[in-house]
Amino acid sequence: MSMIPLLSSVLLALMLFLPSTALAVETGASLFQNNCASCHPNGENIIRRGRTLKMKALTKRGLDSSEAIAQVAREGIGQMSGYADALGEDGDVFVAEWVWQQAQKAWTQG
């Protein structure tokens, strides 16, 4: 009988966590489409070849986490200016987590 409260707690935690995770992914994707995709379609870079959002290019520049990508989204790097104002509060985190997930999947959709 002691398993029921434990299972209920786990189920409640999952129900509370999963919708926010789905919202963060949707928000990150939307922010990327609205602010980044014109220069970075499918993780490419139309301004500077080789400065893509693909895993190999990211890690080569030391951008090996969503936190590092969030900093670039917020503050900019090289020719790219920061987008803190455009992305809004926590937008850098949402878009960076989405970009990091896409890089891990080699930017394949589905």
Regions found by a protein language model. Name each.
Residues 26, 63, 86-90:
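Soluble non-cytosolic domains of exported or imported proteins
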Residues 26-34:
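Local sequence-structure signature of Cys/Sec-based thiol-disulfide redox active-site neighborhoods
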Residues 47-56, 72-110:
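Axial heme c-ligation environment in periplasmic c-type cytochrome domains
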Residues 1-25, 105-106, 110:
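N-terminal export/targeting leaders of redox proteins
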Residues 29, 41-71:
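Gly/Gly-Pro-rich "capping" loops immediately C-terminal to redox-active cysteine motifs
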Residues 20, 24, 69-72, 92:
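Generic hydrophobic secondary-structure packing signal
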Residues 33-42, 95:
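The canonical Cys-X-X-Cys-His
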